[in-house]
């Protein structure tokens, strides 16, 4: 096993901050308890566009399923069952998306690399700690700096523009649920599209929809393409995330081939750590732990961050 001083290649050694350093630590370093009461949001142009596109595509799919395929159907129970199922999956997917986007992924407080903070740690002789030169914080083990969030994130897996946030220690659960529910709703939409095409061909496109045949074909084709793309992407991401959790290894650690200096959790221990508690239906609930939080603009030097 390598010594702790060489275990992370992305860490640079810098002296700790002094009282004369040109860094506004008073305004940028807030307590973790205070940050827990605020909503987290990253003001990144690309991320916000991707997040809005995600919502629009889900709303489009819901429109086609509801108004093009189900409401015109003569089978009442077919429409009710599939309508309730698809809309539930859509709500769960969008809720998981919101929780992923608005949850602090595990950001390390900025500017805490001060002598006063160091003295409060009561370090053992010879113990090595690291300072991130970009956000001036004491960098915990397995934390990595995100250039978009402009923060060090604990157990950072990757930054996903589609949720406009990093996937890290505190929001990985919601990201996994988001990919799962999008994949399930995509499969459901593709099955409904197939049944709708069969129904329209048998009825010669006259009674299968309230829209004209050309419009119906265009809407269904676009939904099929969307469903295929969404299912492929989210199914792969879901499998990758589950594999990472079971192996207790983030995507960054895997890509950088970092040798583990921590004691890896067993497969079920990793799942329990991410989803909380023993296996239950609560694992699939994106509303667990939800509470309304206050929104507050915060000015950050040199960063597009607007965190809550």
Swiss-Prot record:
InterPro entries linked to this entry: Palmitoyltrfase_DHHC, PFA4/ZDH16/20/ERF2-like
EC numbers for this chain: 2.3.1.225, 2.3.1.-
UniProt topological domain (Lumenal) ranges: 72-75, 195-217
GO biological process entries: androgen receptor signaling pathway; glucose import in response to insulin stimulus; negative regulation of catabolic process; peptidyl-L-cysteine S-palmitoylation; polarized epithelial cell differentiation; progesterone receptor signaling pathway; protein localization to plasma membrane; protein palmitoylation
Membrane-spanning parts: 51-71, 76-96, 174-194, 218-238
PROSITE patterns listed in its UniProt record: DHHC (PS50216)
UniProt keywords, alphabetically: Acyltransferase, Golgi apparatus, Lipoprotein, Membrane, Palmitate, Transferase, Transmembrane, Transmembrane helix
Family classification: Belongs to the DHHC palmitoyltransferase family.
Subunit structure, interactors included: Homooligomers. Heterooligomers with ZDHHC3.
Native source species: Rattus norvegicus (Rat)
GO CC, alphabetical: endoplasmic reticulum; Golgi apparatus; Golgi membrane
Protein name: Palmitoyltransferase ZDHHC7
Domain DHHC: from-to ranges: 130-180
Functional note: Golgi-localized palmitoyltransferase that catalyzes the addition of palmitate onto various protein substrates and therefore functions in several unrelated biological processes. Has no stringent fatty acid selectivity and in addition to palmitate can also transfer onto target proteins myristate from tetradecanoyl-CoA and stearate from octadecanoyl-CoA. Palmitoylates sex steroid hormone receptors, including ESR1, PGR and AR, thereby regulating their targeting to the plasma membrane and their function in rapid intracellular signaling upon binding of sex hormones.
Family matches, as Pfam families: DHHC
UniProt PTM: Autopalmitoylated.
Catalytic activity: L-cysteinyl-[protein] + hexadecanoyl-CoA = S-hexadecanoyl-L-cysteinyl-[protein] + CoA; L-cysteinyl-[protein] + tetradecanoyl-CoA = S-tetradecanoyl-L-cysteinyl-[protein] + CoA; L-cysteinyl-[protein] + octadecanoyl-CoA = S-octadecanoyl-L-cysteinyl-[protein] + CoA
């Amino acid at each position: 096993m390598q010594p702790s001083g060489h275990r992370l290649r992305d860490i640079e050694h810098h002296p700790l901050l002094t009282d004369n350093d040109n860094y506004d630590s008073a305004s940028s370093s807030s307590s973790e308890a205070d940050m827990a009461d605020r909503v987290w949001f990253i003001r990144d142009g690309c991320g916000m566009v991707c997040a809005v596109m995600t919502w629009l595509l889900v709303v489009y799919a819901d429109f086609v399923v509801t108004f093009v395929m189900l409401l015109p159907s003569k089978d009442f129970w077919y429409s009710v069952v599939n309508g309730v199922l698809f809309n539930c999956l859509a709500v769960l997917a969008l809720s998981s998306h919101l929780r992923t986007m608005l949850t602090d992924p595990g950001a390390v407080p900025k500017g805490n690399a001060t002598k006063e903070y160091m003295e409060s740690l009561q370090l053992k002789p010879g113990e090595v700690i690291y300072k991130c030169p970009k956000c001036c914080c004491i960098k915990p083990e397995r934390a990595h700096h995100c250039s978009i969030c402009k923060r060090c994130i604990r157990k950072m897996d990757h930054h996903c523009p589609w949720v406009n946030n990093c996937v890290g220690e505190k929001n990985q659960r919601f990201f996994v649920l988001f990919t799962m529910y999008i994949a399930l709703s995509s499969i459901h939409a593709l099955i409904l599209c197939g049944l709708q095409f069969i129904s329209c061909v048998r009825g010669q496109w006259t009674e299968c929809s309230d829209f004209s045949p050309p419009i119906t074909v265009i809407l269904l084709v676009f939904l099929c393409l969307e469903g295929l793309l969404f299912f492929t992407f989210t199914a792969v991401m879901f499998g990758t995330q589950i594999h990472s959790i079971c192996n207790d290894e983030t995507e960054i650690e895997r890509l950088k081939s970092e040798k583990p200096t921590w004691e890896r959790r067993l497969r079920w221990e990793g799942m329990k750590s991410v989803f909380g508690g023993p296996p239950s239906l609560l694992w699939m609930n994106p509303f667990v732990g939800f509470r309304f939080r206050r929104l507050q603009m915060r000015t950050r030097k040199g960063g597009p961050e607007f965190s809550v």
